Amino acid sequence: MKASLTRLFTEDPLARLARGNPAFVKRYESEPDPFGFSLETYARWEPFFRFLFEDYFKVEVRGIENIPAERPGILVGNHSGLLPLDGAMISMAMTGQHRAPRRIRYLVTDWFFSLPGLADWVKETGQVRAT
């Protein structure tokens, strides 16, 4: 446990993500994103959201095989409260459990894009302005 925590804070995040999910990194490492998604930022935050997915919420995924590997699709989550954690959990499932790991874009309220320091993070982690 201690060695993995040390590695979490000392290893290059993108190298760690590439080792754990090479198909996802290969798919998006050279693709410019019109919405501002940053693979480096995603890699930096992936362990936190993976912890929420696997250990905190203990998400159980069913039906992921029905989501197309290439074609567009719409996934609808329903959340209450301010934070769109359903979108983040769907993203974790799609990057970690789908046969063709895909980036998920989830809609967030404009308000997040007006907050100093948070606006860039929101874009870089794959979120899109809802209006």
Regions found by a protein language model. Name each.
Residues 1-130:
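Membrane-anchoring hydrophobic helices of lipid-metabolizing enzymes
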